[in-house]
Amino acid sequence: MDPTLTELLHSNLQWIFVGGKGGVGKTTTSCALATLFATTPISDAAAPDGTRPRRVLLISTDPAHNLSDAFNQRFGPQPTPVKGLEDTLAAMEVDPKNFTHGALMSSLTGANSGGSASSLSREAEADAVEQTASFARIGAVLKEAARTMPGIDEISVFAEILHYVRTLSYDLLIFDTAPTGHTLRLLALPQTLNSTFDRLMSLEGLAPMLEAASHLIGSSLGAVGGDSVSGCEVATAMPSSSSTAPGAGSAATGSSQGSWSITADEVRAKALHWRQVMEEVQDRFNDPSRTSFVCVCIAEFLSVYETERLVQELMKYNIGCDSIVVNQLVLKPSSEPPCRMCAARQKIQTKYLEQIDLLYDDFHVVKMPLLSDEVRGIPALKMFARFLQEPYNPDTHGYIDVQESC
């Protein structure tokens, strides 16, 4: 097959995940790919010339973010335009702390439960304050546990995916993923959460228990002044669901009578809404016309075999993957004199390249050269991206000097 990502570039994909073993160049590849897409117009029959600029959002899901380093620009948890490509490319780095510092956690610590207690007797006021302090202490423990909870990185990333699942703000989302293990847990989340919700909602007594608990918490927190605890709906952590959940509006705003509560019907409605959104995410994951995974590796034993395990897992989750980028290849012009170290590296790499060609003969395998310098900044990323759509030939292109090319 064509040893480039040209077919990917001219597709109408909406989500592209870039992943692989740590240290193989995932971030460089995803940033270069985002730059390439952002500078390539998208077909639009309504536009005068039949095309329009493609709006791309690059999201880092790796807890150790590197997008800021690759672009020489600071990014945060909100989409930020990339300098030089402000109209077509934005980037963001998902921060799990934003997920655990939401309104739900704040409310549990009593941050929103202030108000006047002048109408209460001294005894009632003291009891209410003591109860609220107890909930605050419990909330603080829950908050700290949430920050360090295993899987919180994947859950926070999934919350961002839910947020953008129905947005039309961007034509394409590119995910610079964490190393393989984190990424597989992320991709498995829709199935895992769906089955979990099914089991929970099959428990007939669950919703009434939550309803009773919400009334208890609401009466305790609302006793101090009767103010409602805003933003305490169950789906606070999922950005997209807070405004769209059918029948769930009263969970957050229906506390106007001075207590925080949620009914059994609202619990069921919220759970059904979550399930619907997650099924939509799952459908998009499994649609090769909308989602694709680009594997990145180097021609060494550990990387090649981890890539094979990754491809097998992607097949298990029914996620499309037909592109592999092999980075850091020692490719020398044939006219160059032999180098003992280079020859040794080439021998190792040739061995694993043969295995890659054998295993993935129906994949687009892009072979990228080892460069003389780091790839940082838009000019260097554009130079790198050139060889994602044009096979590198050392006799034709010679050595690629990043600094001179920029």
UniProtKB/Swiss-Prot annotation:
ATPase required for the post-translational delivery of tail-anchored (TA) proteins to the endoplasmic reticulum. Recognizes and selectively binds the transmembrane domain of TA proteins in the cytosol. This complex then targets to the endoplasmic reticulum by membrane-bound receptors, where the tail-anchored protein is released for insertion. This process is regulated by ATP binding and hydrolysis. ATP binding drives the homodimer towards the closed dimer state, facilitating recognition of newly synthesized TA membrane proteins. ATP hydrolysis is required for insertion. One of its GO terms (molecular function) is ATP binding. GO terms for biological process: tail-anchored membrane protein insertion into ER membrane. It is an enzyme of class 3 (hydrolase). Pfam families: ArsA_ATPase (PF02374). Its EC number is 3.6.-.-. Belongs to the arsA ATPase family. InterPro entries: Anion-transp_ATPase-like_dom (IPR025723), ATPase_ArsA/GET3 (IPR016300), ATPase_ArsA/GET3_euk (IPR027542), P-loop_NTPase (IPR027417). Transmembrane segments: none annotated. It comes from Leishmania braziliensis. ATP binds at K21, G22, G23, V24, G25, K26, T27, T28, E300, N327. SUPFAM superfamilies: P-loop containing nucleoside triphosphate hydrolases. Homodimer. Its main location: cytoplasm. Keywords: ATP-binding, Cytoplasm, Endoplasmic reticulum, Hydrolase, Metal-binding, Nucleotide-binding, Transport, Zinc. HAMAP family: Asna1_Get3 (MF_03112). The active site is at D62. GO terms for cellular component: GET complex. It is found in: Cytoplasm; Endoplasmic reticulum. This is ATPase ASNA1 homolog. It comes from the Eukaryota. CDD domains: ArsA. Zn(2+) binds at C339, C342.
